[in-house]
C-alpha cells in the first residue's frame, strides 16, 4: 500500500506518482496504462513534455474513475502573461480530454514571450543558441492569474515548480494564497534542507522530480553508486527502490519515470529503510558531493537567466522577475 499525504487544500495525494517527463510519444501511453494497472493513481504531466494527448487517451482506456486519479499538469513558460494563463489551462484540458486538473503548477519561474501559436511554439528563439525571455511579466503577475483559476472549477489546487523560498514568500505576500505544492529537483546529491524546513513551516508539500538523479549530463548514475547498491543489497531491493524510499521520508512525494513495465512495478513497491540507511544515503550529498542536474542556462538552446544561484549561472545576464 502506497503512503499518502494531505495537501493544504485537504486533498489526499499518493507519495509515489508516475512521471511522464522524457517519456517519448508512442511509449508514454503504454506506460500510463501499465502504471494505472499497477495501482498508481497520482500522474504527473506537463504541456512541455509534448505527450499529453497520448496520456489522455491512455487514461480514458484504463477505465478508472476520474475522481480516483490525482492528475497534475504545468503551465509552460510562454503562457505566463495573466491573459494567457486560463487559455493555456484550457489547451491542456483539451489535450487530455479532461474537465479539470487536481493540481496545476507554474512549471518554471521563467517566462518566454507568447509568439506565434503558443500551443506549439514552446521555445521562441532569440537566436540559434538562446531562447527568448519575457522579462516584463513577474511571478506575482502569473500567480495572481493562477489564483483566479480556483474559481473556475477547472483546477482543484495550484502550486509552483523550481521556485526558491524568496519566490514563494513573494507570491504568498502578494495574494494571501499559499501554493499547495512546490515540485523541485531533489535526490541524495541535492538535499535542500533550508527549503524543506521553510516549506514545512508554511504547509507547502514538496514533490521531488529526478529522484533517481539524472542521466542527461553524462555523470555516473546514482543507481550505480556503491553506497546505494550496498543498501539495496542489504534490504533485498533495487537501487531505484532505495532512492524512492529515501525520497518519501518526511512525507514528500516522488514521481519516478519509466516506460518499462517491470520498472514501473518496482518503483511502486514500497520499501522501508532504517534511520541508519536514510542517514547513509543523505551523506552522499554533503560537501563536495552536492549536484544539481537541471539548470536552464546549461540547456541547449540556453535560457540566459539565473534561477538557482548555482556556479554555472553566475555568467547569466538576467535574473528572475519576482514582483
Swiss-Prot record:
Database matches in Pfam families: Aldo_ket_red
Keywords annotated in UniProt: NADP, Oxidoreductase
Origin superkingdom: Eukaryota
Reactions it catalyzes: a primary alcohol + NADP(+) = an aldehyde + NADPH + H(+)
Binding site for NADP(+): 210-267
The UniProt record lists the keyword Nucleotide-binding: no
Subunit structure: Monomer.
Similarity comment: family membership: Belongs to the aldo/keto reductase family.
Name of the protein in question: Aldehyde reductase 1
Amino acid at each position: 500500500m502506497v503512503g499518502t499525504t494531505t495537501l493544504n487544500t485537504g486533498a489526499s495525494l499518493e507519495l509515489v506518482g508516475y512521471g511522464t517527463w522524457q517519456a517519448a510519444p508512442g511509449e508514454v501511453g503504454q506506460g500510463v496504462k501499465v502504471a494505472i494497472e499497477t495501482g498508481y493513481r497520482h500522474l504527473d504531466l506537463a504541456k512541455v513534455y509534448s505527450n499529453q494527448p497520448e496520456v489522455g487517451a491512455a487514461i480514458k482506456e484504463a477505465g478508472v474513475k476520474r475522481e480516483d486519479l490525482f492528475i497534475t499538469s504545468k503551465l509552460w513558460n510562454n503562457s505566463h502573461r495573466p491573459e494567457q494563463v486560463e487559455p493555456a489551462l484550457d489547451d491542456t484540458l483539451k489535450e487530455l480530454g479532461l474537465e479539470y486538473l487536481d493540481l496545476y503548477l507554474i512549471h518554471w519561474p521563467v517566462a518566454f514571450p507568447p509568439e506565434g501559436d503558443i500551443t506549439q511554439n514552446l521555445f521562441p528563439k532569440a537566436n540559434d543558441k538562446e531562447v527568448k525571455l519575457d522579462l516584463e511579466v513577474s511571478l506575482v503577475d502569473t500567480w495572481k492569474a493562477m489564483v483566479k483559476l480556483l474559481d473556475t472549477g477547472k483546477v482543484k489546487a495550484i502550486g509552483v515548480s523550481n521556485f526558491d523560498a524568496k519566490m514563494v514568500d513573494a507570491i504568498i505576500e502578494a495574494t494571501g494564497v499559499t501554493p499547495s505544492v512546490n515540485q523541485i529537483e531533489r535526490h541524495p546529491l541535492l538535499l535542500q534542507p533550508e527549503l524543506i524546513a521553510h516549506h514545512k513551516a508554511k504547509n507547502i508539500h514538496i514533490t521531488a522530480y529526478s529522484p533517481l538523479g539524472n542521466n542527461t549530463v553524462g555523470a555516473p548514475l546514482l543507481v550505480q553508486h556503491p553506497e546505494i547498491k550496498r543498501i539495496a543489497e542489504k534490504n533485498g531491493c533495487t537501487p531505484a527502490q532505495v532512492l524512492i524510499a529515501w525520497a518519501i521520508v518526511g512525507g514528500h512525494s516522488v514521481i519516478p519515470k519509466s516506460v518499462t513495465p517491470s520498472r514501473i512495478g518496482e518503483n511502486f513497491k514500497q520499501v522501508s529503510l532504517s534511520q541508519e540507511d536514510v542517514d547513509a544515503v543523505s551523506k552522499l550529498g554533503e560537501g563536495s558531493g552536492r549536484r544539481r542536474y537541471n539548470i536552464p542556462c546549461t540547456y541547449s538552446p540556453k535560457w540566459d537567466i539565473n534561477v538557482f544561484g548555482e556556479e554555472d549561472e553566475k555568467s547569466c545576464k538576467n535574473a528572475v522577475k519576482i514582483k
